[in-house]
A protein has these predicted regions:
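Extracellular lectin-like interaction modules
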Residues: 1-221
Length: 221
């Protein structure tokens, strides 16, 4: 448990592994493209900001977090990876968004992938998720539901600025509950295509904007 301050990682990186114990880290910083790996097996993981404070762009290189716990991985701060190839973020297990979270793998020269393997949900407050991958892929596993377990996000933004990568969007919400209660922005005028792959999308009262490049296949349901 690293609750009291920032975990500073130097050299190649850090791996935190437990045999089912919980892992709590307030924030993590690096200086030279360090990697961060957290594997709690059956334990819950709670982590705040990772990277994003190094002006040189050589902070945290990549992030991989794994938890099979029913609570899963709680994120309460931004995740920012550095300008180096394979600057990916991989979240294996359920993900809880607590507060404002921006996962940003887009940099000046290299863009990383963002991967989710399971449900993405809010923590019950004002929980906002932004995904910025540039030319990196955003991958949602086949069983991913955004706003799952009847615990919605407040807002959702996916590559709404400048990315041209194709997007495949999983189920949002359930038959009875919205997966996002507020504003939703998916894609931009450079996005190659937006594929709404599932049969169910339940939005709340906020504006929903889905945008793809003109002249392509646009948005498909």
């Amino acid at each position: 448990e690293f609750k009291g301050g920032t975990l500073h990682v130097t050299a190649t990186g850090v791996k935190i592994a437990t045999a089912g114990g919980a892992v709590t880290v307030a924030s993590i910083d690096g200086t030279e493209d360090e990697t961060v790996e957290i594997d709690a097996t059956g334990g819950a993981v709670s982590v705040g900001r990772i990277g994003g404070t190094n002006a040189s762009g050589e902070g945290i290189h990549s992030v991989a977090i794994t938890s099979s716990n029913a609570t899963g991985i709680t994120l309460s701060g931004n995740i920012t990876t550095s300008d180096k190839a394979s600057n990916d973020v991989t979240l294996t297990g359920k993900v809880v968004i607590s507060g404002d979270v921006d996962i940003d793998t887009q940099s000046a020269g290299q863009d990383g992938d963002i991967t989710f393997t399971s449900t993405i949900k809010g923590a019950g407050g004002t929980d906002d998720l932004i995904l910025d991958s540039g030319t990196g892929a955003i991958v949602f596993n086949a069983n991913t539901v955004i706003g799952g377990d009847n615990t919605p996000l407040d807002t959702l933004t996916i590559n709404s600025s400048s990315s041209n990568v194709a997007l495949t969007i999983p189920q949002i919400g359930s038959g009875s509950d919205a997966g996002v209660t507020g504003q939703v922005d998916i894609g931009n005028t450079s996005t190659a295509t937006v594929s709404m792959r599932d049969a169910l999308y339940n939005f709340g009262s906020g504006a929903v904007t889905i945008t793809a490049a003109p002249g392509g296949t646009g948005t498909t349901f």
